[in-house]
Amino acid sequence: MFIVIEGCEGSGKSSLTQLLKDKLMAEGKAVVATREPGGSSLGERVRDWILDPSTTELSPYTELFLFLAARAQHITEKILPALELGKIVVCDRFHDSTIVYQGIVGGLGKEYVTNLCHSVVGQKKILPNLTCLLDIPADEGLKRKQQQKSFDKFENQSLAYHTKIREGFLSLAESRLDSYLVLDARQPIEESLNKVMTAYTELALCKSKER
């Protein structure tokens, strides 16, 4: 099973990813937790470069295709092998971050970027079984980030930018009610974890009945 955690800056994605991994492993499940950009040696190098605030010369298309290249390697090197072994993969960001950041808000077009994202998964159709969106007002998410000593390229963007990011994620969630779980990131993270576990259990039960 493939579970993706999405959300705006400061929503708690990384924390929920780790908590979910720990919870599933405590129940005896084989779990791989990973992130995007990243997840492979190539992906981590792309992450360091693109997110560096000093990297300002990239065109929107260059940025997009670097993200897609990192994802292609991530799928080949980590995600697909884990899924084929029957493991649960929990990923901090995936396709929808690219669709929102580069397509909807970045101006490259939702449909154009969506089609490119789908082309990256190839014939195996590596798509999430469940996407969990940690939703939080942009200003509150950015306040959480103020505790950091440094900020990456996207975290440095304006409040208006991050508000559009939130709206983009919510619009995707509304169009995919069958596979999206929207969580209030202002609630205790343990509550979000419990809701994700409930959704996972229901999904796992449905998949077992299909066999």
Curated annotation (Swiss-Prot):
Q: Which UniProt keywords apply?
A: ATP-binding, Kinase, Nucleotide biosynthesis, Nucleotide-binding, Transferase
Q: What are the binding positions for ATP in this chain?
A: G7, C8, E9, G10, S11, G12, K13, S14
Q: A Gene Ontology biological process annotation?
A: dTDP biosynthetic process
GO MF annotations in UniProt: ATP binding; dTMP kinase activity
**Catalytic activity from the UniProt record:** dTMP + ATP = dTDP + ADP
Q: Name one GO cellular component term.
A: cytosol
State which Enzyme Commission number(s) the record gives.
2.7.4.9
EC category: transferase
UniProt keyword ATP-binding, yes or no: yes
Q: Which domain of life is it from?
A: Bacteria
User: SUPFAM superfamilies, per this entry?
Assistant: P-loop containing nucleoside triphosphate hydrolases
| Biological function | Phosphorylation of dTMP to form dTDP in both de novo and salvage pathways of dTTP synthesis.
Per the record, the similarity remark reads: Belongs to the thymidylate kinase family.
**Name of the protein in question:** Thymidylate kinase
What's the source species' lineage? Bacteria, Pseudomonadati, Chlamydiota, Chlamydiia, Chlamydiales
